[in-house]
């Protein structure tokens, strides 16, 4: 669906997603070609949850487009408590050209997008992390040359990152396998939606079987923000799901390692893998800015800026 918003990758068509990657690649190669779409304009960046890479990369993306990023902490506005999400969106839309938000509940973004007369972008929610996925597929394309038919294996919690990877895979022709322990699988609704878009998305509980012949092996933390009370339980549940040298050897010498960060060495990934020669994690992190810039340009153009 073509929309002046990006809440999840299924807001894009396959052609739009490919165009996003092409734009990110072109501007990365030639920063002088970046249009100043936000010249003299502000971008409201709302963060209910703490952020490192997302905040820095998005702020720099706004600056790269000629704009002024306005960082707003969740406690400053009290979304849903002191003020409703629609009221916040309407207010910031009166003096900002775009709103981007990192929220606890995906419904907050839906409410903002429905109310705001300017584009709204998801910087992370409990359901999706689309800007991360754009950077991920940009990185995979740089590493492999093409995306169609590539095998991406995600090992770990079937969380928001895995969900956005499923939609990205469907839009690009990448074959995605998600290996998770029982009770932590990617939601079947997401799997069904991705398959309805033409995606090849498979679920398994065996990370080694999943990894065979992979072009890239991806993992994320076992315990996400807000799940700290489950840390001990999750360490037990995810035993055997560490991406280590043995698992990468099963994948094959062609396989790259990806991680959205922050990483916990000795838990979801071994130090030898993340710091090894087949790790593309730092390229992936650097691509967050290029991805954010392309996404912002896309929604701004659709929004008539």
Where in this protein do the model-derived segments appear?
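Positively charged, low-complexity intrinsically disordered leader regions
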Residues: 1-56, 60, 128
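Phosphate/diphosphate ligand-binding glycine-rich loop within oxidoreductases
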Residues: 36-141, 265
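Adenosine-phosphate binding glycine-rich loop
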Residues: 254-255, 260-305
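Short, structured coil segments at secondary-structure junctions
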Residues: 65, 115-116, 172, 197, ...
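Glycine-rich phosphate/diphosphate-binding loop of Rossmann-like nucleotide-binding domains
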Residues: 48-60, 144-219
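Phosphate-coordination loops involved in phosphoryl transfer and adenosine-cofactor binding
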Residues: 37-43, 148-150, 254
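Rossmann-like adenosine-cofactor binding region
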Residues: 195-272
